[in-house]
Structures are given as C-alpha cells and as structure tokens.
C-alpha cells in the first residue's frame, strides 16, 4: 500500500509465497523490501494470541461490510474519520465533565471559604468565651459535688430517719387500731436505734446521740401505745372460746422487749380469762351447755363419783384450753421463761374456781358415801392432780393444792371407814360356822376388799402411788381379819381350828390373787396356810394310825430303848397283838378313803384336800416302815416276822398310792 495514495495493494498469497520460495537464495534487495517485511510480519502473526488485533478486527467488521475496491481504498479515510468522530464525541463528553468539575470546584471553594470564616468566627468566639467556659466547668464540678452530697444526705435520712407515714403510724391516736404496718415501723425504729451506734464511732457523734435519743423517745411512745392497745384487746377476750388475733400475737412478741409492759399485759389477759373460766364453771354446774346439752353438773350430785368426775373433767378441759390460748398468744415470744409465764398465768386463771370446787367436793366426802366410793373418789382426785400437773406443771399451785387437799381428805375418811369396819369386826367376833367355812363377817369384808382393789386396779393413778396405797389398804383390812379369825377359832379343837383357818386364809388368798401388788401378802398367807396344813396332815396321819391299830405300836417303837430289852417281850407288842393290829391295817389298805377325818370334807379347796391326803399317807407309810424295820430286826426276837407283817413297806406304799 502506497503511503501517499491511500490505496491498499493486495498481493495474492500464492504468488507471494512462490516469490519467497523462488528467492530462497535471493539477494539482500528482496530482504530489505518494506512491503515484503510487512507481508511477512502479517503472515507470521498469530491472531489467536493477539487479543488487541482480534478486538480491532471485530470493530472493523462493524462498519466494513462490503469488500470492494472502493471500500478498500477508502478504508484508511473511513477509519480516520471514525476515529475523529469518536474523539470529538469524547471531547464533548469530557467538556461536560470539565464544566461539572469546575462547578464543583467553585462550590468547594465556597465551602472552604465558609468553613474558614466559621473557623475564624469560632476561634474568636472561643477566645471571647474562655472565661465563661472555665466558670461553667467549675460550676458543673460544684454541681456534681452538691448532687453527691444530696445523695449522701438522702441516704443518711433514709437510713436514720422515719418517713412521715411511719411517724403517723407510731404516733396514732390512743384508741386507734394497731396494724401490721405499725410493727414494721416499730422494727424500723429499733433498727435505726441499733444502726446509729455506728455514728458514735465516727466524727458524727453529736448527730448520732441526737438520733439515738429521738429513736429512744419514739420507741417508748410506741411501746406505751402498743401496751394500751394490747390491754384493751385482752379485756375483750371474755368468751369461753377466744380467738387470739395475729396482731395481738405480734404485740406480745414486740412487748417482750419491755418486760414490765409484757408482764402487765399477761396479767390483764389472766384477769379477763379468770372471770371467764369462773363464769363458765358456774354455768356448767347450774345451767349446762348451750340448749341444755350437756346437762348441768349439779343434776348428777346424787351420784358422787360422776359428780366429782364431771367437775374435774370440766376443769381439766378448761385448763388445757387456757394453756392453748396462752401458747397461741406467746407463740412468737423468744424470751426465756415463756413456759414459766404460761404456767403462772394458767395458775392465776384457774385459781378462781378453787373455792366452789372445794366446797362441793367437801360436801360429797363428808357425806361418807361408803368406803368403795370414797376410794374411787380419792383415786379420781389423784389422777386429775397428776394429769393437770402434767399439762401445766406444778406452778398452778392453788388448783393443784386444792385437788391434793381433797385427795388427802377423801383418803383419810376412806381409811377411817376401813378402820371403823375393822374395829367392828373385833367388837363382836363370830363363832365359826358348823361347816368350818369363812364367817359372814369375813365374806362381807372380803367383798368390800375386792371392790376396793378392783376400783384401784381400774384407776389410772401412777404405778408407784397405786402400790403405796395397796400396801396401806391391805394392812388396814387383812391384819384385823387375820386377828378376828384367830380369835374366832381359839375355842375350837386342833383339827377344827386348822380347817377353819385354812378355809379363811384360802378365801383371802383367792381374793388377793386377782390383783397386782399382792405378792408379798400372798406369800405371807401361803406360809400361814402351810403351817395349818402341817397340823391337818399330822392329825390325819394320827387319825389313820389310831383307827388302823398302829398308833400304839408306832409310839412304842419310837420310844423303845435298848435297855428295855426286845420289843417282843414288851406288853401288847407280842406277835398276837401285832397280828390283830395288822388285820385292822389291812382293812384300811382295802378302803383308805373310809379313814378320812370329817374336817377334810369341809375344806373349800380340793387341791388342799388332796395335798393333805397325799402327805398324811406318806407319814402313814413312813410309820409302817419303821414298825416293819423294828419287827424284822432280830434284836427284837420276833419269831417268823414274815408271818406277822406279810406286806413290805413298798407294797403298802403301792397300795396307798
């Protein structure tokens, strides 16, 4: 392509290639040909790796749509014109950008000038207000300090002063009610009074003393108001069943810090409840319960035991109820001696009923309803004394003393009644009945003793007290009975006396065997029975030996001495006499029951009778054994002793067993 004409010369590729091939060994003129170099460069170009060339060709294809000679010749001009148009468009666009930038630059310059002006004005204002800023800073610091001091003051007042509402609660009217808020305010006063002690250990001693004095005065005023209110509340507790309000319980808890006011309030409560209990006791005696149920206690005055029992039961229930009321009243009190306070107040409350109770029980006892009833009443009084003292301790001295006095009085009259009965036994001693059984006086006395002991066994008096009473009762009754029986039997024969005494002692023993605490007396009675049994055993053995013909022979054998010579030579001890005696003894062996003393049939105990028969039979066998040994002894010179005593002692024992 010639640079001046703008034409593009297209050389056929084949010809160019042939020219190159033919000139492989060509000259340097061919090598320096610019056209050849350009063609070679173009032909050697690798379009795949030349992205710029590819982009240029793509752009060329957008407007080079017709491949003709004319378009090829005008291509350079078209490209330049297109480039010029693009550059003009670019210049036009950048001109707009330049104008915008110039506008922005003007704005920025204006803003910069404004900022510079403002900075200058601020600097001038700062220089002018420097003193004001310093003063403001100082005032802010002072404000912070004052705010902190205000907070400290508020905290101080909150901790060491009461609010107006709390002051109103504590300084309320004299007759105004007490609520739970009152106790919260009172607790706050106590807390402040304790906390203010911290100030006394600092530089604020004056303030601490003033606050402490103020709180102490306020406390006294509050406690005085609380005491008056509690007194008024206690005076209203006059119903038989009183309900202790929670506020009154809190009041007693608070008053424990003032022992004198606490004691006065308890006294007021005790006085109110005392009149209520006395009125309730009189109503129970004369009017009965609501609607007549239960019936008045006085209606049972004809039944001494029930009459006394109902009165004591009512008092027991009332005492327990009053203790429960006091426990409810003082349940939050933690001071020492609460239990003693309860016992003391209950003692004061129940003291009012002692006089009417004592008068009525004395009337019952002095009327002497009988030994058994007196003993039951005595045990009843002892039981309630023990029961009530278990509920309230021994501090209720007046009531317990009254019950104890009535117990001792009934016990005294009871033993006087027994002693009188015993003295009557000795004043007129009966003779034993023909059957040698217990006398009517003995039977009556044993019936009385059985009833007394039965009531004693059924009582719920403590074991040690019951045992002591038992010993005294037995001594008061049994000793005169034994003496009466001995005097009554003193005019009888030996066997009759022993039989009568065994029957009487046996009745006493069977009566005592049913009850506790009688072991010692039973042993004593058994010893006396055995002594009289020995008498009956000997009498029965003697009775058998006499009627069986061996009594004289046995006595002679026992009394025989060697210097008297052989037994066979003594009078009535020869072989003939012995054989005659053995005939009678054989009759006894064939029917031993026919030789029983009549007195044995009067014995009340079959066991005792069998014992007497058994042991008396052993004595008979022993006597026969001694006689048999003496007869068989050659020294006594009996001829053919086997024909005289043809039974050995073993055979006799076998027959009698």
UniProtKB/Swiss-Prot annotation:
Membrane topology according to the record: Peripheral membrane protein
Keywords, in A-Z order: Golgi apparatus, Membrane, Protein transport, Transport
Pfam families (UniProt xref): COG6_C (PF20653), COG6_N (PF06419)
Any one Gene Ontology cellular component term annotated for this protein: Golgi membrane
Listed SMART domains: COG6
Top-level taxon of the source organism: Eukaryota
Places the protein is found: Golgi apparatus membrane
TM region(s), chain numbering: none
BP terms from Gene Ontology: glycosylation; intra-Golgi vesicle-mediated transport; protein transport
Main location: Golgi
InterPro entries: COG6, COG6_C, COG6_N
Function, as annotated: Required for normal Golgi function.
Self-association and partners: Component of the conserved oligomeric Golgi complex which is composed of eight different subunits and is required for normal Golgi morphology and localization.
Similarity comment: family membership: Belongs to the COG6 family.
Protein name: Conserved oligomeric Golgi complex subunit 6
Species of origin: Bos taurus (Bovine)
UniProt lineage: Eukaryota, Metazoa, Chordata, Craniata, Vertebrata
Gene field: COG6
